């Protein structure tokens, strides 16, 4: 839906890519203006963008990594398809999307697990039209270890709404 079109700031995308250091093949399912895609250093990279006729939900090729800011209204559907075709999935989204239901938790557990939750402050700090807490969720196929919790902002500046002060 049009409300799902929230472009990721390039500065945010670069920080996320630098943090996770994806190797191998990589897919950006919601390319938009290319904040993630244009900064992937991987040679084997691909993209989807529904507005350009490349529907991610029809993409079937296996990839090593997916890193994206998914459409929030179809979050579960997007995650389910991502888990089918990738070994490592990183979603940049409101963090409450992840822990909303037992059904979703069971799907994640059958895939592997959440390796890391990276808190990145509020949506407004990253150009999102809301102030909910946002961050990255890193899902890894077959993972059964502890979940790491990371903060990607300066804790002493918590509450400041400037992205420059955090990244």
Residue spans for each PLM region:
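Class I S-adenosyl-L-methionine-dependent methyltransferase catalytic core
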Residues: 1-167
